[in-house]
Curated annotation (Swiss-Prot):
It comes from Shewanella amazonensis (strain ATCC BAA-1098 / SB2B). Heterodimer composed of CysD, the smaller subunit, and CysN. InterPro entries: PAPS_reduct_dom (IPR002500), Rossmann-like_a/b/a_fold (IPR014729), SO4_adenylTrfase_ssu (IPR011784), Sulfate_adenylyltrnsfr_sub2 (IPR050128). This is Sulfate adenylyltransferase subunit 2. The gene is cysD. PANTHER family: SULFATE ADENYLYLTRANSFERASE SUBUNIT 2 (PTHR43196:SF1).
Amino acid sequence: MSGPVLSHLEQLEAESIQIFREVAAEFDNPVMLYSIGKDSSVLLHLARKAFYPGKIPFPLLHVDTDWKFREMIKFRDEAAVKYGFDLLVHKNPEGLAMGMNPFTFGSSKHTDVMKTEGLKQALNKYGFDAAFGGARRDEEKSRAKERVYSFRDSKHRWDPKNQRPELWHTYNGQVNKGESIRVFPLSNWTELDIWQYIYQENIDIVPLYFADYRPVVERNGTLIMVDDERMPLNEGEVPEQKLVRFRTLGCYPLTGAIESSATTLTGIIEEMLLSRSSERQGRVIDHDSSGSMEKKKREGYF
């Protein structure tokens, strides 16, 4: 006797929930990396479903670079109160002492110090042996190589040639001494799946994803939002109010906006169906040849 036929989104949801439950059962000290973006919002929703009516049995960790959009930090703090999850926030103290910023030090150095090293510091500090992340295989070519259980060595480095097979959705959680894993429950989701699921489940997301008039300047073909007074303007540069939104969120000086009139979820989904460009086209760090995504991941990046 066959069971009920699940829709595409229901199949993805069931797979992700299974991964959450399996890791929670197998590992001693898991954590969920919370970057506050749309994928993190879906990940949080799935984690709440996986353990309902109980509380999520692990904390959420935000590695704060000190350069996130103000609306992201506001959303993070409100979400922690609304959903009652344990929130850990870590900032690299050495980076803060250096006055690390993407303007003086460059995007690659800033990302390495405040994101990669900051993450490794937090993982070591709390002794986490498994870290959930919201990466998807459709985002970028190095992420397409990643397993659901992504093994990292004692220095949190990723070796794409030294990973475990995952046949028939069977995951090998046996880690060697000093190893840990990053876990990606959204591996098989696409950007369109994410937006359709957000619409279906009525998931809260940062308002920056919706079009609004915002102060931006254009640099090297990228629209950068001037989010606070710390952003140095070039000679003759004047922020212009444009109707824009963001497809991806990160440090505000390193995240490009797109011109858009999509003020609703249905509007965003309609844009998605017509889009022929990557959501990460607005990430300045992805265009830094000295800081490719695969190189960052090998060094311990998300």
